Each structure stands twice: as C-alpha cells, then as structure tokens.
Regions:
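N-proximal low-complexity "stem/linker" segments adjacent to membrane-targeting elements
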Residues: 1-27
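Acidic helix N-cap motif at the loop->helix transition within catalytic regions
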Residues: 22, 48-57
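Short, acidic, metal-binding catalytic loop of nucleotide-sugar glycosyltransferases
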Residues: 26-36
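Short beta-strand/loop segment that forms part of the nucleotide-sugar
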Residues: 36-45, 67-69
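A conserved acidic beta->alpha catalytic loop
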Residues: 43-52, 102-103
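Long helical/loop segments within the catalytic core of UDP-sugar-dependent glycosyltransferases
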Residues: 61-82, 86, 112-185
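Short aromatic/hydrophobic "clamp" motif used to bind/position activated sugar donors
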Residues: 95
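Catalytic donor-sugar/metal-binding loop of nucleotide-sugar-dependent glycosyltransferases
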Residues: 164, 199-218
Length: 221
C-alpha cells in the first residue's frame, strides 16, 4: 500500500476525562491528512460528562466514532477490553493506539507518520519531542514487548514524567497494522514483579540510549 492510500484508525479509551476530551480531542480530529482517517473513543463507563462531550463533538466531526463499555466486570481487564472493542469497530488497516492526554502539537502529525513509517516493521512506537515526533520501528511485536509490557502494565496510579521519554521508552502512541493489534493487546495490563520491572527498565534504557540511529526524528510545521 502506498502512503497516498494509507488510512488510519486512531483508538483511545477514556474514563471520567470530560475536561481532557474537550481540550485535547479536537487536536486529533483536526489533522490535515488527505487519504482520510477516523478517531475511535471507547468510554469505560464514565460517571462525568464524557458521554455528553463525545456526543457534541460527533455533531461537528463525522470521522469521530464513540462507543461505550458496559459496567465493570472484575474478572475482565477493562482497558484491554476497551481497546479490543475499538479495534473491532475500526474500518482501516492501520491502527494507532494512544491516549487523549497525548495531544498532537501539529496538524501534520499523521502525514509525517505515513510518510516515514517503515512498512517492514510489525509495529512502531511514537514519541512526542519538542519540535515533532520520533518513530521507533520494531521488526516484530516480540522485540517491542518489554516497552509495551512496562508502559501498559497494571498500575493503581501512573506518574507522568516529561524528561528523557525516549531513553526510558515512555512512548506516546503505537502504530501497527490491524492484524498485529490483537497480539499487542496481549501484552497489556500484565502483573510484573518489581525485580523483573527493574531488569526491563535497564534493558530499555541502554537499548534506547545507544540505539538512536535506528529511529527517525521528524520535525513538523
């Protein structure tokens, strides 16, 4: 598939994030990308105004689709299930997993991704940098498993850090074909021991510190 035909389904999940939806979601919806794309938001049974905000935005953006995850089932990993629903609802071959708080800072981010993505990579991790984005391709899903298991692990509270995100593997989005998305989701919300987590952190740090030449840094307008 040529870059002129590549279309993306951007998928995110939200829970009680009405304010972030109002502030950040328009930036995802206002991408200037000629082939076309869609944004899919899966609401994890929010108790705030998230549903109302999504309904209002749908009136203005026909490429926004939202769906609702039923009430909690303690035996089910809700975030993983929410992304599964998003993938099933998607209509395009290329999938991007992200978070509403990871607002794109330019309107040409999708164009930059499409123009520079490695078609031979099974998945690509994306990092927001000061003047654009950095893409980190992986030949197989397994090669990226430590990165994904660490960032998407089960946590009661996630601390946001701003510095050295690439070096520590704190990516902002994942790009992959649809048939790889389910394999990626198998790495979400795992329980990892502190000892194993420390080993993963050190592995990612040294790999990314000395592997910068394997990435592409893109400066957007």
């Amino acid at each position: 598939m040529s870059k002129n035909e590549r279309r993306f389904s951007i998928i995110m999940t939200v829970y009680d994030q009405a304010g972030e939806l109002e502030e950040n979601l328009p930036a995802f919806l206002q991408q200037e990308y000629e082939p076309g794309y869609e944004v899919i938001v899966v609401d994890e049974s929010s108790t705030d105004r998230s549903g109302d905000v999504l309904k209002l935005l749908r009136n203005n953006y026909p490429h926004l689709y939202s769906t609702f995850l039923p009430k909690p089932n303690r035996l089910v990993s809700r975030r993983k299930l929410a992304f599964h629903l998003g993938v099933k609802a998607s209509k395009y071959e290329w999938i991007i997993f992200t978070k509403v708080e990871r607002k794109p800072e330019a309107t040409d981010i999708l164009t930059a991704i499409s123009d520079n993505i490695d078609d031979d990579a099974e998945l690509t991790l994306g990092y927001s940098v000061k003047k654009g984005i950095r893409l980190q391709p992986f030949s197989t899903c397994g090669e990226a498993s430590n990165h994904i298991r660490r960032i998407e692990r089960k946590l009661s509270k996630v601390r946001e850090r701003k510095r050295m995100n690439y070096t520590w593997g704190r990516y902002d989005f994942i790009v992959m074909r649809k048939d790889v998305a389910y394999e990626v989701l198998n790495l979400f919300e795992q329980n990892i021991s502190p000892t194993k987590m420390l080993a993963i952190r050190h592995h990612i740090f040294w790999k990314n510190l000395f592997g910068r030449s394997a990435t592409t840094k893109l400066v957007t307008q």
